[in-house]
From Swiss-Prot:
It comes from Mycoplasmoides gallisepticum (strain R(low / passage 15 / clone 2)). It comes from the Bacteria. Coiled coil: none annotated. GO terms for molecular function: large ribosomal subunit rRNA binding. This is Large ribosomal subunit protein uL10. GO terms for cellular component: ribonucleoprotein complex; ribosome. Belongs to the universal ribosomal protein uL10 family. Keywords: Ribonucleoprotein, Ribosomal protein, RNA-binding, rRNA-binding. Forms part of the ribosomal stalk, playing a central role in the interaction of the ribosome with GTP-bound translation factors. InterPro entries: Ribosomal_uL10 (IPR001790), Ribosomal_uL10-like_sf (IPR043141), Ribosomal_uL10_bac (IPR022973), Ribosomal_uL10_bac_type (IPR047865). Part of the ribosomal stalk of the 50S ribosomal subunit. The N-terminus interacts with L11 and the large rRNA to form the base of the stalk. The C-terminus forms an elongated spine to which L12 dimers bind in a sequential fashion forming a multimeric L10(L12)X complex. GO terms for biological process: translation.
Amino acid sequence: MKAIIQKKIEHVNKIAGLLKEAKSFVVFEYSTMTAKAITALRRKVKTSANQMFVLKNNILKRAIKEAGIDGFDDDIKNQIAVVIGLEDAFLPIKAVHEYVTANEKVKYVCGYLENEKLSAAELSEIAVLPSRDELYSMFLSVLQAPVRKFMYALKAVADTKQQ
């Protein structure tokens, strides 16, 4: 019996360590997801340095407490899974959002981003925001637009002078 308790303590410590390092994490109900969908989500999340765990509520509550994060005890119930973002803070939110929108029975429970607890509504709002790379490309296209228009104007003037 003590060996099982020791394994649980090690598991809690492992999850707590990951939560301390995490830039974000998302807790969601997975009970209506098929095994195939859960595996697909796991694969998508693991493409970068992020991880997904299906945990017992008690283990997750203890790990969150041990990581020094407060305010999650009331939200964690039913069958839940957690996606932890170690490098990209927004990838876990966006990855889970795809499954939340595809299957209305899969629900956000809560999340954590930049030392703040997020509600399900806040997670939904964040998930539809463009990523950092998308924002950079939008910004660069805005910067290039005046130069591009000027170039086309010069080309039109050159074409009219050639005729």
